[in-house]
């Protein structure tokens, strides 16, 4: 007897496949489109989690109310600083599996999470803005200026944050304490 896919699971799988293939028509893309040029001409910092990241640097950003992106386990710094990123980005399956509760508790403007993590790994982040990813072409990462279609995947989530920042109209993006 052949293994049969449960009818509900089959429908879910086909729906997910359709959304990934036609992301621009999805409710997720519609939510992302609302962000287009919302911070036109403003500056932001893309904060890496490198070992040289200091709380003093973050406090300066906090005191000057500078827009910023943080990612992955940046919340581990929160007990040492008043700074919080305005935007959070993650596409790391293992980190999200391990830290889903922490990410759900983040009280920030927006959390950007790869839709793959929701669909394939059942990682459901409260109030997340889900994005689709496309891999590189012949090893060269694709930079997308239309995140409602896809974000070009790279070895670093900072690359994803930069694409989101550009889409939102943030013209001066400063990467800070990022490692590749």
Residue ranges and their predicted role:
Residues 17-25, 38-42, 126-129:
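Short acidic/polar alpha-helix capping motifs at helix-coil junctions
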Residues 8-9, 49-52, 135-140:
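Short amphipathic alpha-helical segments, especially helix-boundary/capping motifs
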Residues 22, 64-67, 73-166:
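Acidic/Gly/His-enriched mid-domain segments of enzyme catalytic cores or analogous surface patches
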Residues 45-51, 153-166, 171-180:
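Glycine-rich anion-binding loop/nest that anchors nucleotide
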Residues 25-68, 77-80, 84, 89-90, ...:
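Intrinsically disordered, low-complexity segments enriched in small residues
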Residues 1-33:
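Membrane-proximal basic amphipathic "stem/tether" segments
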Residues 12-14, 55-57, 117-122:
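Short, mixed-charge, low-aromatic patches
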């Amino acid at each position: 007897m052949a293994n049969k896919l449960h009818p509900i699971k089959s429908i879910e799988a086909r729906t997910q496949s359709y959304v990934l293939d036609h992301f621009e028509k999805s409710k997720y893309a519609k939510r992302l489109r609302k962000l287009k040029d919302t911070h036109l001409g403003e500056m932001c910092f893309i904060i890496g989690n490198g070992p040289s990241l200091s709380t003093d640097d973050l406090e300066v950003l906090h005191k000057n109310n500078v827009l910023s992106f943080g990612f992955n386990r940046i919340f581990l710094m929160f007990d040492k600083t008043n700074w919080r990123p305005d935007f959070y980005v993650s596409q790391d399956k293992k980190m999200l599996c391990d830290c889903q509760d922490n990410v759900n508790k983040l009280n920030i403007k927006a959390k950007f999470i790869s839709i793959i993590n929701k669909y394939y790994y059942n990682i459901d982040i409260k109030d997340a803005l889900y994005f689709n990813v496309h891999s590189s072409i012949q090893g060269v990462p694709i930079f997308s200026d239309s995140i409602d279609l896809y974000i070009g995947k790279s070895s670093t989530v900072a690359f994803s944050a930069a694409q989101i920042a550009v889409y939102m109209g943030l013209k001066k993006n400063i990467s800070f304490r990022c490692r590749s």
